[in-house]
């Protein structure tokens, strides 16, 4: 329970940092017209967007990793205190679920920061953060709001399938699902299932994040800056 709450807090902090940084920094470039000075130099718009995005991610990842390291050390100390007979095997004390939770938190941050970057091209900070908040809530709950049932009308099934394709399912990246997958009965099939779960979550998040960043570059290339 403590581990799950700590990872959720780290995730929310990282999401807030990434979204606020992208919404404030990029929007401020347009408000102060400093983007014109940057683009007058031999810097393409692609590199401008990628530089902003990667810089924000570097700072956010450093924050999340440092907090995750503190949490993991605290869990190792707690596990060491619960073991008897002076167990010295470090691998038995490392909380791999915590590490996986931190990594999947970063995947959520990657996606939502990219969404915020796109919105920052046209919206101010308050509108940007508001949309990101509703986007995050919807992506964590739409598997309940839009359940896929075979008995539904075909048109409704198509609509819900489109929603599953357009919106990332953050619920598959949170600690509830991670605990369900890891805590299942140990077997060769379960080990393979965990590996598939990690690969699927990572690949899907990477593809979605790449598509959103490409959209940001596409829109920024066509944006008139006066």
Language-model regions, residue ranges each:
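Secretory targeting signals
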Residues: 1-25, 49-125, 148-165, 194-196
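Alpha-helical transmembrane segments and their helix-entry boundary regions
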Residues: 37, 48, 128-132
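Membrane-interface capping segments at transmembrane-helix boundaries
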Residues: 217-226
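Transmembrane helix boundary and interhelical loop/hinge segments in multi-pass membrane proteins
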Residues: 19-39, 43-45
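Terminal transmembrane helical anchor/hairpin motif
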Residues: 1, 88, 122, 127-218
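Alpha-helix N-cap/helix-start motif at helix boundaries, enriched for small hydrophobics
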Residues: 46-49, 220
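Membrane-helix interface/capping residues of multi-pass secondary transporters
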Residues: 34, 45, 125-126, 225
């Amino acid at each position: 329970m403590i581990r799950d709450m700590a990872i959720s807090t780290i995730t929310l902090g990282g999401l807030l940092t990434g979204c606020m940084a992208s919404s404030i920094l990029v929007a401020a470039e347009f408000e102060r017209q400093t983007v014109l000075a940057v683009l007058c130099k031999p810097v393409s718009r692609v590199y401008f967007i990628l530089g902003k995005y990667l810089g924000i991610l570097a700072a956010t990842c450093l924050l999340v990793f440092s907090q995750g390291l503190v949490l993991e050390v605290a869990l190792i100390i707690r596990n060491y205190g619960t073991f008897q007979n002076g167990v010295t095997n470090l691998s038995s004390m490392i909380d791999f679920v915590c590490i996986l939770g931190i990594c999947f938190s970063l995947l959520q941050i990657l996606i939502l920061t990219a969404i915020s970057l796109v919105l920052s091209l046209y919206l101010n900070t308050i509108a940007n953060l508001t949309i990101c908040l509703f986007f995050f809530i919807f992506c964590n709950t739409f598997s309940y709001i839009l359940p896929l049932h075979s008995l539904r009308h075909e048109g409704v099934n198509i609509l819900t399938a489109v929603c599953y394709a357009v919106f990332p399912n953050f619920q598959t990246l949170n600690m509830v699902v991670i605990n369900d997958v890891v805590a299942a009965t140990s077997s060769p099939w379960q080990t393979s299932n965990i590996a598939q779960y990690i690969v699927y979550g990572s690949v899907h998040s990477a593809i979605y994040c790449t598509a959103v960043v490409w959209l940001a570059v596409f829109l920024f290339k066509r944006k008139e800056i006066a």
